Amino acid sequence: KLVYDPFAGSGTTLVEANALGIDSIGTDISIFNVLLSKVKTADYDIPLLEKEIYDILKRLDAYKNKFSKDEKVNKLFSTKNEYIQKWFAPNTQKELLCYSRLIKDYTYQDLLKIVLSRSARSARLVTHYDLDFPKEPQTKPYQCYKHQRFCQPVEEAYKFLSRYTIDTLDRVKEFSKIKTKAKVIVNHADSREVELPMGIDMVFTSPPYIGLIDYHEQHKYAYELLGLKNNEKREIGPAKNGQSQQAKQDYIKGINDVFLHTRKYMAPNALALIVVNDKYGLYKAEDAGFKEIGRVERHVNRRTGRREGAFYESILIWQKI
């Protein structure tokens, strides 16, 4: 049995396949998504991880106490990066950069990078109700729609770094109880041309929605802090391309190219389950070498941030022909 996700994203398909004892492969054009998927599905020496987790927090706390007293320490953790200077308060910058510098001393560097990026997301100068698509930094107190009161801009990262470091350890421990020895492979590549093994039994994926999200821009805090390579020019259907007729044509060509390529590696009669928001009716199974044998509609009511209107998804069930 082999499951494939050509739009691996944060690795949900890979995690669930492993828990079920099924070998899986994921591909994503975003190196941040690849890093996240690898961290979620990696094997860990739990006692060593626990030791490293508490050690980095202890060292961060020691440096944190010197920030207001020692100018040499302050200079160690400064940056000329315009994005970091714009979107993080001065003290937040120091704490994030300190944690970042300490990561190189540990075995599980990729996991600590994910903790850093997760903390950075929460520690930005943004409103609590607009973590997904902030347009400008929030530097003054504001009326918070999420908490129904006035809230202050975030001025520290330490509370997030501490909370998420421990939380990540807890998540790894929890997943280790059900993790199997099933293989997980994560490719950093374009799904339209990536080389795959023959005999894929099932594709389970959720392609990007047309004109909704600029996926690299959405995680820019991670790209800037971790120095990751940006591949946004290879994204399919990014928000900046809009939802014009031309954008729709480009989008569905990109999607069909992915499935036509993937199809070559699939077993006879193999299934593809595709979660989409197909309000424009762009998905035609026959154009990608499949036939549609079923469709399930679902209302999505668990989302971060404030978004207008009801949101629906379809689960397309396609079979290779």
Model-derived regions: residue spans:
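Conserved proline-anchored active-site loop of SAM-dependent methyltransferases
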Residues: 3-20, 24-31, 37, 112, ...
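Conserved beta-strand segments of alpha/beta enzyme cores
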Residues: 23, 183-185, 291
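Short amphipathic alpha-helical segments
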Residues: 38-39, 101, 215-218, 285-286
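SAM-dependent nucleic-acid methyltransferase catalytic core
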Residues: 91-204, 210-213
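Conserved Class I SAM-dependent methyltransferase catalytic core
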Residues: 99, 109, 240-295
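SAM-dependent methyltransferase catalytic-core segment centered on the flexible catalytic loop
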Residues: 197-202, 208-268
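Class I S-adenosyl-L-methionine
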Residues: 277-321
